[in-house]
């Protein structure tokens, strides 16, 4: 089993780059968007449907999988990919973000974090080692260190303390992971923290780069800050990351944010927004959002997007989708999710083509005008 990342082309005007990941025999073109399958399912889609959107890699969540179905189940089935019959690549985050979002239900110290299950209140204690052990059983190709994600408006002192704790945990995660056979086929990413503070972001990036992880994630963004703040942080922190390694921005799928992040050299993205918004009646198109619940679509015989090649757009009108929503049919979230996930993959393919043809700056301006 193996992992390689090659930069194939750099934009002449920005830091955008075209790349290729090969992980355990699976090729992934970058920049890439990963649909989120939190609980071992991308909501409303079968693995075959996911594959048909041309998604090569999906994300699952350690916190949720530890709670349900539980590690004993996943161990019996040989990991989450076999459990759900997914043949592509997978990344699992450590569950740190979910644990820290519980706020009232958790207690943090330098050893780890104690929390109560949001399902039944039962107690759990995540440590760097226990998270690694869980991710080894879950068995994703890419795995993440336990980290502490602070709020965007947290104080300097709090963010600094959380950053030091993140570094300590990253070191412990890596030391344990590297001592196991799993390091031969599971690849561990370090998470850069530091909030909105330039000096802390620089320190975090340099500390983690010195630990020599196979890839790096920019954490602590898309947590309430403005798009301008996100872009400013990215433009600074990317100066200190390793350009030879994939760089992953967690929790982002807004086209504006992806375009800005790719401009700074980000390679990987994930977010629940395309699937969640689909279930709530919002279809993404290259000309903006279609809110299919609007009564104006009741008699509309056009498809969601003329140039889209997804199953939904090849077969069904806006009027039919509007009807499915009004009658609360199960087919509605399925068809909408197929479209939105396929939209994200079409968007990323167009974006990659613009880098290959060295017209990314023009493409970014054009897409910004269409969306905003």
Swiss-Prot record:
This is Queuine tRNA-ribosyltransferase. It comes from Brachyspira hyodysenteriae (strain ATCC 49526 / WA1). NCBIfam families: Q_tRNA_tgt (TIGR00430), tgt_general (TIGR00449). Its EC number is 2.4.2.29. The keyword Magnesium does not apply. InterPro entries: ArchSynthase1/Queuine_TRR, TGT, TGT-like_sf, tRNA_ribo_trans-like. Homodimer. Within each dimer, one monomer is responsible for RNA recognition and catalysis, while the other monomer binds to the replacement base PreQ1. Catalyzes the base-exchange of a guanine (G) residue with the queuine precursor 7-aminomethyl-7-deazaguanine (PreQ1) at position 34 (anticodon wobble position) in tRNAs with GU(N) anticodons (tRNA-Asp, -Asn, -His and -Tyr). Catalysis occurs through a double-displacement mechanism. The nucleophile active site attacks the C1' of nucleotide 34 to detach the guanine base from the RNA, forming a covalent enzyme-RNA intermediate. The proton acceptor active site deprotonates the incoming PreQ1, allowing a nucleophilic attack on the C1' of the ribose to form the product. Binds 1 zinc ion per subunit. GO terms for cellular component: cytoplasm. Zn(2+) binds at residues 308, 310, 313, 339. The active site is at 93 (proton acceptor), 270 (nucleophile). Belongs to the queuine tRNA-ribosyltransferase family. GO terms for molecular function: metal ion binding; tRNA-guanosine(34) queuine transglycosylase activity. Pathway: tRNA modification; tRNA-queuosine biosynthesis. It catalyses: 7-aminomethyl-7-carbaguanine + guanosine(34) in tRNA = 7-aminomethyl-7-carbaguanosine(34) in tRNA + guanine. Residues 275-279 are annotated as: RNA binding.
